[in-house]
Amino acid sequence: MNKLKGLIFDLDGVLVNTKKIHFDALNLALSSLNIDEISFKDHLNIYDGLPTIEKLQILNKKKILNKKYNRIVVKKKQKITIQLLNKFILYNPKIYKTFLKLSKKYQISIATNAVKKTLDLCLKKLKIKKFITFSYSNEDVKKTKPHPEVYLRCLVKMGLKPSETLIFEDSHHGVMAAQDSGCYLYTVKNISDINYSNILNIINNLGNSMKKNKINVWSDSKLNILIPMAGAGSRFQKAGYVFPKPLIEI
């Protein structure tokens, strides 16, 4: 195994406890238009980890929400979310100390399905932005989780291979994206998992945990040839590919 060089963290449910906040904000936005609320069980099993617009598209298909109200609900939900985040998300000294120490050894990035405004507010509340190399919100990608684009973009930005990178995720959709990226994955049960000693233990036992979780990381020590392809690759980009054209899998 190559030496680990990069760490990528999801935001919601990993660094901040926001599942209930997003649940309440969405239901408050729906109820303001006299639309039936969703249960917390459904939110966890179906909607958790998805951008708001994709949650609404599911409600559209279920005939719970008329599509014409989507834009209104998105605006209301985001406004309520920011209000709740400002009220309930607090500085976490354990997270701060963890990122302070980790940043001395690894590149750190954040990859979330949250909007940029939510991402920036949470990083400000946690006071960890200075330890992060860069961050991506759902506004920075064409395809959100469970598509792996956000993680592939992180790899390109960091200049790292999947075998050099560990992802921390919690939601079903996020885990799917992380697995499809080919990176190492640690599934977070709760925010208390994110502490320096635990993360070092995870890294030190990475090989064993990968085998236990049966996550396949692609590698081939014999492959060392890169064959460039002509053209700018605009058709590939429009089709949703993230990596530069010469690096697209065939």
Predicted regions mapped to residue ranges:
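N-terminal glycine-rich phosphate-binding loop and ensuing alpha1 helix
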Residues: 218-250
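Conserved hydrophobic helix-helix packing surfaces used for dimerization/oligomerization
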Residues: 7, 165, 223-225
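Asp-based, Mg2+/Mn2+-dependent phosphohydrolase catalytic module
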Residues: 1-3, 116, 121-214
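Short, flexible loop segments at the rims of nucleotide/cofactor-binding pockets, characterized by
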Residues: 84-90, 113, 248-250
